[in-house]
Amino acid sequence: MDFNFNLDLGLGTETKTTELSVNEIYESFIIGGGPAAMTAAVYLMRKGIKAAIVAGKIGGQVGDTKGIENYMGYNYIEGDELVSKFSNQVRQFEIAFKEYVFVENIHLEGDIKVIKLSDGFEYRSKTVIIAAGSKWRQLNVPGEEKLRGRGVCYCAICDGPFFKGLDIAVIGGGNS
């Protein structure tokens, strides 16, 4: 008697993502491109659930983060490097994928959710996972954008160790 315990999760090195189809009704539709959205995509794909993911940009805030020292498994990793790892992991699965678009509207047609994107196309799904993340509250002062990640940061607890022994200014964003 022979047993075959091979489990093909589609974890090869090639990209298997597909384009979104207006003719499909997806089991699940993920909105967002950060760590939560990427994790949801991996879990859905591993369970064989037909899904799609749309994002303004892959990585979310992580992509705008210079250095990360509090992500398990890495003593230090640059944000863009971590985003690349997220993207590579998700793209190993057959998931419908679209980047650089935003959701404009979600409405119901019976039990089906209709998701209208900024490119004008509408997609249908039985469920929607909203993992849209958040964004930093900016001060809109001269030089802020240019110095983001090189002196201007938005998380004192996260980035404080990078500035040990330096003179700094902490400015509240009014969102605490």
Question: Where are the model-predicted features located?
Answer:
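Glycine-rich beta-alpha-beta "Rossmann" dinucleotide-binding loop(s) and their flanking helix/strand
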Residues: 2-12, 119-121, 128, 132-155
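N-terminal Rossmann-like dinucleotide/flavin-binding domain of flavoprotein oxidoreductases
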Residues: 2-9, 63-122
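Short, flexible, glycine/charge-rich loop motifs used to bind or transfer phosphoryl groups or to couple energy/partner
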Residues: 17-19, 61, 105, 118-119, ...
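Rossmann-like dinucleotide/flavin-binding elements
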Residues: 19-54, 58, 148, 154-176
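Core beta-strand elements of the Rossmann-like FAD/NAD(P) dinucleotide-binding domain
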Residues: 23-26, 117-127
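Short glycine-/acidic-enriched loop or helix-start segments at secondary-structure transitions
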Residues: 40, 63, 108, 139-141, ...
